[in-house]
Amino acid sequence: MFRKMRRAEKKAIPNEEAIRLLQESKRGVLAVTGDDDYPYAVPVNYYYDAAAGKIYFHSSLAGHKVDAMKRNPKICFTVYGEPEIKDLDWAPYVKSAVVFGKAQPVADPEKKRVVLKTFAMKYYPNEAEADEEIELD
């Protein structure tokens, strides 16, 4: 279904490291099929639910990204770590996790509230600020 990484034995990181990147990174790049089938990639905040194996994005209900996902739910999402330069090498090494999937909105209001609260706790320093932001949403 998906191409194998070229030279994967030298470049691929273990799944555990990819999951750690998804759990620890604050932002990633979401790529969708945009207008006239041009790729459209945009930095986004997200929350990774490791137990469910799902990635949640927060978004407005309208706009280029949302319209694109409604037309074609296939997406690609990438997160990456800090560059590291190894001894005697000129190029930085960057660990990344690339995830393919299909986007769908969270329809159930209670599920949406729970996901939004967990999402907010990732970005806000305390629960009161997270609750305040959710109320504004």
What are these regions (language model features)?
Residues M1-Q23:
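Extreme N-terminal tail/first-helix region
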Residues F2-E9, I85-D137:
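Charged, gly/pro-rich active-site loop segments
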Residues L22, A68-M69, F119:
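A generic structural signal for nonpolar/aromatic side chains embedded in well-ordered alpha-helices
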Residues S25-L61, M69, F77:
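Short beta-strand segments
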Residues K26-R27, K74, Y124, A128:
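Generic structural signal for secondary-structure transition and capping sites
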Residues S59-H64, A120:
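Short, solvent-exposed aromatic-acidic interface loops
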Residues S59-L61, R71-E84, Y93-Q104:
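Active-site-adjacent structural patch at catalytic or cofactor/ligand-binding sites
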Residues K65-R71, L88-D89:
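A short, polar/proline- and glycine-enriched secondary-structure boundary/capping micro-motif
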